[in-house]
């Protein structure tokens, strides 16, 4: 079975090179792996690197330029060019083991999955030793010990999606270009429509975390944004679910109050548990203030010294 493998990228040449080289090294795949790199930098900064690597790719390697900033724009442009029955997504800060594609496809076939997710193992270059376990967990993705159907969904990096489910020109919501969460909205809708979601326990990838991201200044706003997911999803569907949203807002208020004070006290005391507790408080606050979006992508990355880059 052939598969389209999409790598959206934004001004991350070293990460893109690592991701591509790991894809070139894939083994055990019976069908074609058609690679699509979608460059989301306005200046098209990845073009030269992709053209340099193309002769040694061993697979079809297509470069696309989506100059309009936004992760949803980049994903949508790449999806339009995908012609295979399934699409794999790998981020430009991820590296895949040589059997990754084969294991993702194997999980799809074993469970007749519409969507497959795999684990992510964070690799930190440096971090405050006191909070290192928290940062490793924050940037990693964990799931069941064994492969099989799951009731929930994860993020787009290290996922496989049935191409037929990505209908229209904009399967990823472009209103989420700057704040992210376009994948959450898509997967929520697919789940509501009965899509079969599966976990591939052995199909992991590594994610490289730069020093600029291994800080509470970066992770707590991200935790806030992650916390917004349930409330936002309740109001984004058709029909809207205000009672469900109200439930999550109340849940978030309690969470923010309970963990906020405790987290600040632990941080003042120098406890290594502070980061984990403050993270819970931030996620609770996100459930409550779900309508206030923080920019992490798109035009936010065009500002001088954007967070986490």
Model-inferred region functions:
Residues 118-119, 133-152:
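Short, flexible, basic/aromatic active-site loop/helix in glycosyltransferases
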Residues 221-225, 238-309:
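Non-catalytic, C-terminal membrane-associated alpha-helical segments of glycosyltransferases
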Residues 87:
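Short aromatic/hydrophobic "clamp" motif used to bind/position activated sugar donors
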Residues 22, 36-49, 94:
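A conserved acidic beta->alpha catalytic loop
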Residues 99-131:
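Conserved donor NDP-sugar-binding/catalytic core segment of glycosyltransferases
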Residues 12-25:
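Short, well-formed alpha-helical segments that are part of the catalytic scaffolds
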Residues 177-186:
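Acidic donor-binding loop at a coil-to-helix junction in glycosyltransferase catalytic cores
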Residues 66-82:
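Glycine-rich, basic loop-to-helix element that forms the pyrophosphate-binding segment
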């Amino acid at each position: 079975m052939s598969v389209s493998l999409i790598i959206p990228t934004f001004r991350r040449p070293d990460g893109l090179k690592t991701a591509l080289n790991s894809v070139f090294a894939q083994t055990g795949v019976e069908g074609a792996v058609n690679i699509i790199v979608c460059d989301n930098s306005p200046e098209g900064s990845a073009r030269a690197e992709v053209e340099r690597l193309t002769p040694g790719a061993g697979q079809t390697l297509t470069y696309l330029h989506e100059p309009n900033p936004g992760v949803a724009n980049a994903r949508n442009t790449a999806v339009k060019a995908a012609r295979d029955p399934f699409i794999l997504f790998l981020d430009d800060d991820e590296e895949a083991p040589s059997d990754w594609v084969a294991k993702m496809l194997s999980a799809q076939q074993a469970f007749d999955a519409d969507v497959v997710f795999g684990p992510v193992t964070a690799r930190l270059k440096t971090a405050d030793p006191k909070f290192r376990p928290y940062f490793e967990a924050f940037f990693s993705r964990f799931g069941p010990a064994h492969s099989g159907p799951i009731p929930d969904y994860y993020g787009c990096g290290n996922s496989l999606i049935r191409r037929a489910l990505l209908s229209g020109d904009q399967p990823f919501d472009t209103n989420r270009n700057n704040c992210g969460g376009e994948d959450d909205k898509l997967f929520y809708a697919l789940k509501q429509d009965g899509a079969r979601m599966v976990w591939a326990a052995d199909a992991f990838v590594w994610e490289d975390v730069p020093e600029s991201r291994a800080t509470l200044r970066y992770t707590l706003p991200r935790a806030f944004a992650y916390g917004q997911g349930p409330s936002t999803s309740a109001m984004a569907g058709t029909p809207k679910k205000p009672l469900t949203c109200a439930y999550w807002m109340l849940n978030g208020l309690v969470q923010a109050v309970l963990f906020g004070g405790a987290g600040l006290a632990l941080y003042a005391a120098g406890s290594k548990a502070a980061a984990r507790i403050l993270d819970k408080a931030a996620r609770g606050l996100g459930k409550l203030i779900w309508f206030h979006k923080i920019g992490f992508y798109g035009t936010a990355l065009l500002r001088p010294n954007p967070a986490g880059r």
